[in-house]
Amino acid sequence: MLELKNVCLSYGKLEVLKNISLRLARGERIALMGPSGCGKTSLLRVSAGLQKPYSGSVINSAERTAMVFQEPRLLPWLSAEDNVKLTIPAGAKTSSPPVNWLERLGIAEAAKKRPDELSGGMQQRVALARALAYEADLLLLDEPFKALDAGTKENVIKTISGSTDAAIILVTHDAGEAAALGCRVIELDTFGL
């Protein structure tokens, strides 16, 4: 589903990914762990096609890819429900309407509220609801649980695990999150795997 071969990426003179090779099968779940600044987020961005490596190749054969960023990227003039609706392709027969995704993630009361009326944790759950409603076959999750308390995090992880058979790449600093989501852990150090 996703294959990176000898991927290199730099920001100016700072090389953040050096000869990274990685293969992710359909339905497989991996967690990228390592120190801050080692390239975990950059690897997700390259995998999503948001950044082009200066060398190497990226083959993403997923029909639909969804990415949840560290900081929720919600449209501020839309309600939570409308932010989720945006990802549902026209004419798609979805398994669940947007408000159901919000309910499953414990924020049904936020459906009609704009992002500026929500806490950081609630905004993050709206972003997760949006990704799940898209019914992607590849989910790229960049520290999606960092703004959540322990109980909420546990519920959200259970919801994700029970709601999708998508391949997942999770960026996290928490081995417990990786284990709860059923991820194989890949350690990155400076510049590589």
Question: Which residues fall in each region the model found?
Answer:
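A short, proline-enriched helix->beta-strand linker immediately N-terminal to the Walker B motif
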Residues: A133-D137
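Conserved ABC ATPase signature
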Residues: R114-L118, M122
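The feature captures the beta-strand-to-loop junction immediately N-terminal to the Walker
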Residues: M33-P35
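Conserved ABC ATPase "signature" region
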Residues: S95-A110
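Conserved H-loop
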Residues: A166-V171
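Helix-to-loop junction immediately C-terminal to a conserved catalytic motif
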Residues: A48
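Hydrophobic anchor residue at the start of the ABC signature
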Residues: L128
